[in-house]
Amino acid sequence: MTQSGQAESETPSTLIHCVRDRQQAKRELERLANRSTGNSQKQAMATVEDILDTVRSQGDQALITLTERFDGFRPEPLTVAPEELEDAWRKTPQKLQSALELAYRRIQDFHQHQRPNDLMVQGIHGEQLGRRWRPVQKAGIYIPGGRAAYPSTVLMNAVPAQVAGVEQLVMTSPAGRDGQINRTVLAAAHLAGIREVLRLGGAQAIAALAFGTETVPKVDVISGPGNLYVTLAKKAVYGQVGIDSLAGPSEVLVIADQSARVEQVAADLLAQSEHDPLAAAVLLTTEASLAEQLPSHLEAQLKGHPREQICRASLSNWGLVVICESLERCAQLSDHFAPEHLELLVEHPHAIADCIKNAGAIFIGPWTPEAVGDYLAGPNHTLPTCGTARFSGALSVETFLRHTSLIEFNRSALEATANAVRELASSEGLHSHAESVRIRFE
């Protein structure tokens, strides 16, 4: 093991390390899944709790003071004027406008199919039993800033809320030191019909949405990814408001066999690693020759790369190649990791896809790079990370909906079930439960 705790590489490259041993592979995948935890999270949580308390007690003034401290400008006003949104769209190049419009249409088209239907059934004694869906009234969406601008995330969060029927949608995103939010992000907000935009980032933005201030409305649900402080803030306010998920750093896992082209594999791993130094890029392959060729292709594609240092940090710390004896073993290891994004660069991808139990999104075949899912395929790109695909899924229309049970008994239905209700109530020692049934027949 190296001082950093990584397994020694079986390839000559120090850029990404390779293992063959089954148990070592599982240990490495577990290390990658836990890459966002540790002492830094405990320290950050103390800061987050202080920020939440300050915003709750001081409102707008806290937002201004905290933004000046952390982001280097005074957000006065806190809100972006509608004219700024319109201006951002007008100044967006035509080709980019067209690309955003295409993405918006495709995301809308897919999410329209996610609307659940109300349910009403009749029981055996004539009772009516149902489930009714209704949207939350207010939702807040957080759009990260920092290393890159994410107009696609605006669309991916706004569309399901709109399809759900949310009445009021509030967007918040960190601004630069000049006080301006990225123009393309504002253009995407304009396209999506968002009218309330805040120049706020970090835990203070989440606090504002969760508690409300003089300017910021208190919302019912908060969605959207962010850095560690944003994620911890969402975790802390959950229960006061609903949240979509606790997003960690992004990841991709590629399963490849002899049919895969090594240059495509390299490009897809780099497409993930360029996000963040904490992004994880994993290759599971049955082909030792593919694993051996990969480092040189990564190096070649990194030459002149505008985000080379981020890619190198990601791959050297959180990159992994595992040589497996079979595709079945690849699928088992993938399920153990439960990746956010799973690419299947294999000869018979549907056979593998059918075996997969845990993945945020599966990209099937050589013509489906993760990038199409990130931008405009249609399914949501806000996905579970760091192993949470074992028990959760993508952001969806249902994130912004609540379902209410509907129950209507008539006299005969209550008569037919009254003895059982009273018996169950008595077994739990709840006298008035039983009495509430009996008294109806006096």
UniProtKB/Swiss-Prot annotation:
The protein's Enzyme Commission number: 1.1.1.23
GO BP terms in the entry: L-histidine biosynthetic process
Names of required cofactors: Zn(2+)
Binding sites annotated in the UniProt record for NAD(+): Y142, Q204, N227
List of residues binding Zn(2+): Q272, H275, D374, H433
Binding-site residues, substrate: S250, Q272, H275, H341, D374, E428, H433
Disulfide bonds: none
Protease found in the keyword field: no
Coiled-coil regions, chain positions: none
Pathway(s) of this molecule: Amino-acid biosynthesis; L-histidine biosynthesis; L-histidine from 5-phospho-alpha-D-ribose 1-diphosphate: step 9/9
Keywords: Amino-acid biosynthesis, Histidine biosynthesis, Metal-binding, NAD, Oxidoreductase, Zinc
Superkingdom of source: Bacteria
A GO MF term: NAD binding
Segments passing through the bilayer: none
Entry GO CC: cytosol
Cofactor binding remark: Binds 1 zinc ion per subunit.
Active site: E340 (proton acceptor), H341 (proton acceptor)
Annotated catalysed reactions: L-histidinol + 2 NAD(+) + H2O = L-histidine + 2 NADH + 3 H(+)
Cited PANTHER family: HISTIDINE BIOSYNTHESIS TRIFUNCTIONAL PROTEIN (PTHR21256:SF2), HISTIDINOL DEHYDROGENASE HDH (PTHR21256)
NCBIfam families in the record: hisD
Protein name: Histidinol dehydrogenase
